[in-house]
């Protein structure tokens, strides 16, 4: 089930929010601690066609209630008399609030310092205060912090258990919980109405991650990296393609802290493939048991696939980004290589730069590398035996192709910025740092008459190659245009 958290500040807003949520979920959590004035819960609940879970949390539990503890207890008792399906009680409050009517008791264990030392002991304590459902919640900014919550909600216990991840791991927990068929997972009604930081909205879960499609037979494809706009677009596009081909795979964001023990945990979740964000490409290649040719030679990986002999790393970006660039340079056929003997300046020293340098070299381009991080650029130049250009000498260095491969590079006049005057009409410019989105650098390059390689074209080409590796099928041609048309 899906539980939408509603945290209104006024009685007038609460009615509208509850009715809005009712059409999109199975259970509604009404957070009384956000009200500016004491609400009439009985009146608010009248006419709401979905079961209600009432909560009124203390600040130490992540709530907003500003009154005294006695006032909070009074409000909870009044709420129970109104007859909601559930009332949330913390371990300290529960013994003071007797069971009343048909309202079930959700005993909440919020631990702002992380998982309790003894989960079983806490579970037993919650059972003693007449819990019908037990909720465990703690900060979970990473997949590693989500993992103990996953272990708890996946265990078969006498009393049903739900979990709430506070932070970026909330989407991950909600989606896996859906596949595990836990009693419910939490979502916010819309952006700005989250009951806890990092809570996904109902549209995030349904429109991006295909909540309604997920069940015990779903096979997840991990998206390793930050839970950001690029991850959302990747998930939306891949999920649309999976759905169009009637494939049971769906995307799962994995905001990891490191690759340590990741493979073991993925195997326990029966996840056999992950796409890797550019900033983690080098670490992904290092942690794989095997590296396919380009992943070995570039030292980067954007795709990991689990096989019988372990995890194998693949690098898809170099080939397809280089192909899109050469198409923009006027490639005539598959035997023509416009990069041959062209001077290509790569700006950046991270995983994107490393992968692309490998691609340019494979296409016989002449590579130079520069970055505001001089040490990183020097090391990259040594690794690939290419020319290093000190960043302060950038404006004395002319090139046929400029490739931005570092998100920190901006237009401007600072020491680590690029001045617009650098661009010439003879240049081709490619910015990989914010794919598939456009950037101010590309806008300036267009205005100055440069040949611009569209980042959405590169993103689509790489994503299509990854999709084919995952499924053995071609990426549906119409999906990408549909996804871009619906992006804000």
Regions found by a protein language model. Name each.
Residues 46-47, 99-101, 338-339, 361, ...:
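Short, conserved loop/helix-junction motifs that constitute active-site signature segments
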Residues 165, 221-228, 313-318, 325, ...:
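Glycine-rich adenosine-cofactor-binding loop
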Residues 218-331, 436, 442-444:
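Phosphate/diphosphate ligand-binding glycine-rich loop within oxidoreductases
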């Amino acid at each position: 089930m899906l539980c939408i958290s509603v945290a209104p500040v006024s009685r007038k807003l609460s009615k509208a929010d509850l009715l809005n949520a009712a059409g999109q979920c199975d259970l509604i959590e009404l957070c009384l601690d956000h009200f500016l004035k004491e609400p009439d819960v009985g009146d608010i609940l009248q006419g709401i066609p979905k079961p209600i879970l009432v909560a009124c949390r203390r600040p130490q539990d992540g709530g907003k209630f500003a009154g005294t503890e006695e006032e909070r207890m009074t409000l909870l008792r009044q709420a129970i008399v109104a007859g909601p399906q559930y009332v949330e009680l913390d371990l300290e409050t529960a013994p003071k609030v007797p069971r009343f009517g048909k309202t079930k008791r959700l005993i909440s264990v919020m631990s702002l310092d992380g998982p309790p030392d003894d989960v079983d002991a806490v579970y037993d304590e919650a059972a003693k205060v007449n819990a019908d459902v037990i909720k465990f919640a703690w900060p979970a900014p990473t997949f590693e912090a989500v993992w103990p919550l996953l272990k708890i909600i996946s265990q078969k216990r006498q009393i049903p258990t739900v979990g709430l991840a506070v932070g970026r791991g909330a989407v991950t927990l909600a989606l896996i919980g859906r596949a595990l068929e836990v009693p419910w997972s939490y979502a916010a009604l819309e952006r700005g109405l989250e009951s806890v930081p990092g809570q996904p909205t109902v549209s995030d879960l349904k429109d991006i991650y295909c909540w309604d499609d997920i069940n015990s037979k779903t096979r997840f494809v991990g998206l390793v990296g930050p839970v950001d706009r690029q991850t959302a677009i990747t998930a939306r596009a891949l999920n649309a393609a999976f759905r169009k081909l009637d494939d049971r795979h769906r995307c799962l964001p994995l905001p990891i802290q490191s690759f340590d023990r990741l493979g073991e945990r993925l195997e326990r979740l029966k996840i056999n493939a992950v796409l890797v964000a550019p900033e983690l490409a080098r670490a992904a290649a290092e942690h794989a048991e095997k590296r396919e040719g380009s992943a070995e030679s570039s030292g980067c990986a954007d795709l990991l696939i689990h096989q019988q002999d372990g995890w194998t790393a693949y690098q898809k970006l170099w080939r397809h980004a280089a192909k899109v660039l050469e198409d923009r340079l006027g490639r005539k056929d598959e035997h023509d290589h416009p990069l041959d003997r062209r001077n290509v300046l790569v700006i950046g020293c991270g995983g994107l730069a490393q992968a692309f340098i490998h691609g340019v070299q494979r296409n016989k381009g002449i590579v130079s590398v520069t970055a505001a991080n001089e040490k990183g650029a020097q090391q990259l130049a040594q690794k690939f035996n290419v020319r290093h250009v000190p960043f302060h000498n950038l404006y004395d260095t002319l090139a046929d192709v400029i490739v931005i491969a570092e998100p920190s590079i901006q237009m401007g006049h600072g020491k680590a910025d690029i001045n617009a005057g650098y661009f010439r009409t003879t240049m081709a410019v490619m910015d990989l740092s914010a794919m598939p989105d456009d950037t101010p650098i590309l806008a300036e390059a267009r205005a100055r008459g440069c040949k611009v390689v569209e980042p959405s074209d590169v993103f689509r080409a790489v994503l299509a190659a990854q999709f084919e590796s995952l499924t053995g099928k071609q990426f549906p041609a119409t999906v990408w245009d549909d996804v871009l048309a619906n992006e804000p």
